[in-house]
C-alpha cells in the first residue's frame, strides 16, 4: 500500500482541477465540488486509486516486469527522469517519438547507434581518421540521440506497464501502449478521460509538487516490487542449494549393486 496521507496530497495541491468550463463529464464522479470556477477533486477517491495503481505496479515489477515512466511536459520532466533513474526503470522526459513502442525494432536500432557513438573519442582527430567537422557532426548526432533516447537506452523490450503524468499531453504514448496491450497508470485531471487508461489517478497534473509526489510514489512501488523479486530469487536459490537429506540419499542408493554403490555415491558428490 502506498505511504501517503491526505495532508501530503493537500500540501502538494493535488485537489485542484481545471476551470469548470474545461472539464470532462466523465470525471464527474471524482469531483467533490467547485470553488471560484475551479473544480475540486475528491482526494478520498484519489487515495483509493493511488493504492490500486501502487499495488499493480509493485506486482508487475515483482513478476519481472518493467515500467516505462512518461512525462514530457516541463513540470514533469525532472521528476520523471529522476525517479525512474532511482529505480533503474526506463523513461521518456523529452518529446515522445512516434513509434517508440509500436515500431520498437527501429527505435532499438537508433539506441544501438547512440551506444556506438558514445564509444567514440571526439577529441581524437588523428586516431579517428576523421576531420574535425565530421567529428563535430557525429558528436551533435550523439547529443541529439541521447536527449531523445537516453532514458530508454537500456530498455531491451517493450515495457510491461507505463506510468504517465498527463494523458492528454501523452495521448500518442497511451495510444501506442493500448495497441500493444500495455496497461497504463496515469494522473488524470478534470479535463481528461479517466476511461482512457486502466489505472487512472484523479489528481492535479500541472502542479510540480503534486507530480513529484505521485511519481515518487510510483517509483516506490517499483522499488518494493524489485525487493519482492530479489526475495523470491534468493529463496529459490536457497532452496536449490539446500543439501540433500540423508533419507533422500538412501533412496538413490537403495537396491543398487554393492559394487556400483561407491561409484554412484561419488557421482552424487560431484552433482552436489
From Swiss-Prot:
Keyword Ribosomal protein found = yes
Q: Name one GO biological process term.
A: translation
Q: Which domain of life is it from?
A: Bacteria
Q: Which GO terms describe its cellular component?
A: cytosolic small ribosomal subunit
Q: Name one GO molecular function term.
A: structural constituent of ribosome
| InterPro entries attached to this UniProt entry | Ribosomal_uS2, Ribosomal_uS2_bac/mit/plastid, Ribosomal_uS2_CS, Ribosomal_uS2_flav_dom_sf
Short name of any one Pfam family annotated for the protein: Ribosomal_S2
Which keywords fit this entry according to its UniProt record?
A: Ribonucleoprotein, Ribosomal protein
| Chain residue ranges for the region called Disordered | 251-272
Which stretches does UniProt call biased (Low complexity)? 253-264
Family matches, as NCBIfam families: rpsB_bact
By sequence similarity, the record places it as follows: Belongs to the universal ribosomal protein uS2 family.
Query: Under which name does UniProt file this protein?
Result: Small ribosomal subunit protein uS2
Query: Which source organism does the UniProt entry give?
Result: Bifidobacterium adolescentis (strain ATCC 15703 / DSM 20083 / NCTC 11814 / E194a)
